[in-house]
Amino acid sequence: YYYGGTTPVERTFGGRWPFNLYATNGYIVYVMQPSGATGFGQEFSARHQNNWGKITADEIIACTKAFLKAHPFVDAQRVGCMGASYGGFTTMYLQTRTDIFACAISHAGISSISSYWGEGYWGYSYSALASANSYPWNARDMYTLQSPLFNADKINTPILFLHGTVDTNVPIGESIQMFTALKLLGKPTAFVQVVGQNHQILDYKKRAEWNKTIYAWFAKWLKNQPEWWNAMYPEKSL
């Protein structure tokens, strides 16, 4: 797990990402603090500006490989990753850069920097800092080459997209278009919309279902136990 947005990862249990529950499900949990997070000084956070994943992806890939090398009891063929918001973007972008992950989960992630730039309550204000002085018309390479959507054909990792249907921060279209691209490319993927929820899943029952969805996806791809997922989301033929 890596950050949601650029909020620092805390050394806590419980909360939105209950690492202790993943451990009780038999997973080894590795939590990273990539560059760009706030709270570690201006130089550290400034690495996020006009970068959109380059440094972060390099760090996550290098750290994951180093962790696997240092802990040989971890099965390198069964590693999953997940993140939310900017961390959801990171999840998508990582899969365009590496195949070291057996599966991935993006919650409320950004798939196209150019569409997110003018969307939602936060798109423009967030981009004013994260993409300072860079716009779709004067920084075309960043807006396209760093956008997962424009690199969807490079993805082989099964990705689960989760998104609240009334997300005002990262509009749900960001997940819809990436899911559509991967389906057209014949890549393994799934998309679960959480009805009536915003950027965070706050309704108790819906949050419980959201958590179960995450566990079921990991069980399917990391434990070779698809039964839970299939029971929750049986295949449908149109």
What residue ranges belong to the model's regions?
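Active-site-proximal cap/loop segments of hydrolase catalytic domains
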Residues: 1-2, 8-25, 31-238
